[in-house]
């Protein structure tokens, strides 16, 4: 069990906190209804292999790197970016009266999402509201902890990066 004082529920997030993204491994398990409408030939080649292989890349498990960060840093909020993408999942981990600000220019959108969007002529807001767009998990931390958290995640092979901040 987790001590009550160590539960990460977003209630301590404050203005200026930093949003750190851990990259996803692909589509994960969300948005396949939309994928099925767009992709009709699963043998079609994509990056030198059938697109089905890319679409079925296993979902990354974030437990070990996130637990390592939790042991060393005061993580104020966490969000696993699943169905609903960043717009639906991030606000749930931010305290009332605050909101997450994601700087789209800082995102590292995976090519598979660009491909799906182009093939299906899907509006950007629908893409961001359906898929993780390359962000699998987000940690909300104090600005002073940002570099240390990113370095800790790197020890686990994660190329984490800042994607935004919390504002009132």
Report residues per predicted region.
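A glycine- and small-aliphatic-rich helix-loop capping segment at beta-alpha/alpha-beta transitions
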Residues: 1-4, 37-42, 95-99
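Short, well-ordered alpha-helical segments in soluble proteins
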Residues: 20-26, 39-46, 70
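Short, compositionally biased
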Residues: 32-43, 153
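N-terminal low-complexity, intrinsically disordered patches enriched in charged
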Residues: 25, 35, 92-94
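Glycine-/charge-enriched secondary-structure boundary and capping motifs
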Residues: 43-56, 60-168
């Amino acid at each position: 069990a987790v001590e009550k004082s160590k539960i990460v529920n977003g209630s301590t997030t404050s203005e200026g906190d930093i949003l750190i993204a851990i990259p996803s491994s692909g589509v994960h398990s969300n948005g396949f209804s939309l994928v099925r409408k767009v992709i009709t030939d699963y043998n079609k080649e994509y990056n030198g292999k059938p697109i089905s292989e890319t679409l079925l890349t296993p979902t990354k498990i974030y437990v070990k790197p996130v637990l390592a960060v939790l042991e060393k840093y005061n993580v104020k909020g966490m969000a696993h970016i699943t169905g609903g993408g960043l717009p639906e999942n991030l606000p749930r981990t931010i305290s009332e009266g605050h909101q997450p600000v994601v700087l789209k220019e800082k995102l590292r959108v995976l090519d598979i999402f660009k491909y799906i969007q182009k093939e299906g002529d899907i509006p950007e807001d629908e893409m961001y509201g359906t898929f993780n767009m390359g962000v699998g998990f987000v940690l909300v931390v104090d600005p002073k902890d940002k570099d240390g958290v990113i370095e800790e995640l790197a020890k686990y092979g994660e190329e984490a990066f800042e994607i935004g901040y919390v504002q009132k």
